[in-house]
Amino acid sequence: MNQSLTLAFLIAAGIGLVVQNTLMVRITQTSSTILIAMLLNSLVGIVLFVSILWFKQGMAGFGELVSSVRWWTLIPGLLGSFFVFASISGYQNVGAATTIAVLVASQLIGGLMLDIFRSHGVPLRALFGPICGAILLVVGAWLVARRSF
């Protein structure tokens, strides 16, 4: 996939996330628990991915799925569910902009730390730009979020 298409997908996913969370908040407003919205979200994804796996690989795909399960392979699903829960809660309690600002800033810091940890021997000079960018993003997130906390 070329860089332009990747950028377009990332932008579409970012906008889609705002729409998704807004709709999920609406579901929680007509439900007794946030779990209804989360389960509907997961159910749609499961049906979609099961259908694609069946279409592409048939029963062999399900055999591979079962053989791929390890205890640690369940962690991304738990973290994804936590992310969805935190996002919906954030939209409900502090609004979309604050939620997005805090999530993006914390993701950038975590990603930058991971990149620094993985990049053995990278000169400090090469990290100056990314670190300054992260600081500016955190300051921007604080400016957006300070009214909510």
From Swiss-Prot:
Example of a GO biological process term: bacterial-type flagellum-dependent swarming motility
Entry keywords, A to Z: Cell inner membrane, Cell membrane, Membrane, Transmembrane, Transmembrane helix
GO cellular component: plasma membrane
Main location (coarse class): membrane
TM stretches of this protein: 5-25, 34-54, 71-91, 94-114, 124-144
InterPro entries noted in UniProt: YdcZ
Topology relative to the membrane: Multi-pass membrane protein
The keyword Glycosyltransferase appears for this protein: no
The keyword Transmembrane belongs to this UniProt entry's keyword annotation: yes
Subcellular localization(s) per the UniProt record: Cell inner membrane
Periplasmic face residues: 1-4, 55-70, 115-123
UniProt topological domain (Cytoplasmic) ranges: 26-33, 92-93, 145-149
Top-level taxon in the UniProt lineage: Bacteria
Pfam families according to UniProt: DMT_YdcZ
Protein name per UniProt: Inner membrane protein YdcZ
